[in-house]
């Protein structure tokens, strides 16, 4: 099993402390991996900085060819990636292979094409005897920090636009889920020029802080928690680095009386519980208009109760475990505090699963109120709440009354209502009569405490560039 770092084109063993990497389905240690030392962090950044002198001057066509080759390698090693992600994250193998891996390769292919379409603007003459033009140029070294819930996909979301724009990258996966990133490093080592892509491993305090604070790093891109985002913004403030933050979420799902009940139930069953609910866009905060509320709660309870929890290798498993024992206890705490409220009804689930691994039952809590902790805070587990509402004005206010602003959805047959509300929901993405759907061509990113900056799309590519004005006198 590949567990080495990638520094300046070479796979090397970390020189820091040994850290265990667990299989959350069993609680067993899969492998022990050595962190990068402080010297290795510096080596990776300096290698990226040196490589930028050449990589930043390559043509979009050259960069696109590298990204397309990497996409092909991901496709040809898809089963290996899926197996590693399943072991390390506890996800059902078939979900990773069929749902995630095609999207990972597609992101690299999209940005390969997008890089060839990125251009500045020839602006014209705004001062007599002078011609101005606008350039979009790469920034330099980008430090990318990926999360544990989608380690390979988030690595792709960060690497593809940064490399396509002409930057060099030092990527640090979560210390809990590095295995697919190590495999990606192995493939990239023989593909990219030395230093263009570097992969480190370690904890935030020992590796992440040194990486993000390095004076040669021009931009830091994070997908992670709000607390981690706050820390990195503060830690990098003295260096005035550009930051790109995709942080937490608590997606409101607005269900009106005229919604298609079956579509809503099927959508929440899928989109509220994918990856055991460990997703910033999970359909977890349901608001149901009072006319449809009783039927929705009943139908949802039956649908969610039918979800199959099981070993990741089992083709019939729909939910795997939570990522760590600590995170399981966090989810248990949220649910226990909610269950203690007299107005909250446990429709289904609500308990941990006995046995090995960090499993929690898919859970539906009805009658939760707007002010309840379970409604206001991100649980990041297989837990969905349903709250009844009266009318558009009330539910719009409740949906926007949140510190989060990443994703939302509304379910109605009324086109006018859909347009009215989608224009006023304070979220980076709003789906109508669906949820969770992402494509490489469209941007993904948040507002408020959910962060700023966009992943995917041409907007994502532009985020990794500097706008420059060049003026000619003639």
From Swiss-Prot:
Key words, A-Z: NAD, Oxidoreductase
This protein's record includes keyword Oxidoreductase: yes
GO MF annotation terms: aminobutyraldehyde dehydrogenase (NAD+) activity; NAD binding
Pathway: Amine and polyamine degradation; putrescine degradation; 4-aminobutanoate from 4-aminobutanal: step 1/1; Amino-acid degradation
Entry binding sites for NAD(+): 146-148, 172-175, 209, 225-228, 280
Stretches of the chain forming a coiled coil according to its record: none
Reaction catalyzed: 4-aminobutanal + NAD(+) + H2O = 4-aminobutanoate + NADH + 2 H(+); 5-aminopentanal + NAD(+) + H2O = 5-aminopentanoate + NADH + 2 H(+)
Gene3D superfamilies reported for this sequence: Aldehyde Dehydrogenase, Chain A, domain 1, Aldehyde Dehydrogenase, Chain A, domain 2
GO process terms (BP): L-lysine catabolic process; putrescine catabolic process
Enzyme Commission identifier(s): 1.2.1.19, 1.2.1.-
Catalytic residues (UniProt): 246, 280
Biological function: Catalyzes the oxidation 4-aminobutanal (gamma-aminobutyraldehyde) to 4-aminobutanoate (gamma-aminobutyrate or GABA). This is the second step in one of two pathways for putrescine degradation, where putrescine is converted into 4-aminobutanoate via 4-aminobutanal. Also functions as a 5-aminopentanal dehydrogenase in a a L-lysine degradation pathway to succinate that proceeds via cadaverine, glutarate and L-2-hydroxyglutarate.
Assembly: Homotetramer.
HAMAP family hit by this protein: Aldedh_Prr (MF_01275)
Stated family: Belongs to the aldehyde dehydrogenase family. Gamma-aminobutyraldehyde dehydrogenase subfamily.
Note in the entry: 4-aminobutanal can spontaneously cyclize to 1-pyrroline, and 5-aminopentanal to 1-piperideine.
Name of the protein in question: Gamma-aminobutyraldehyde dehydrogenase
Source organism per UniProt: Serratia proteamaculans (strain 568)
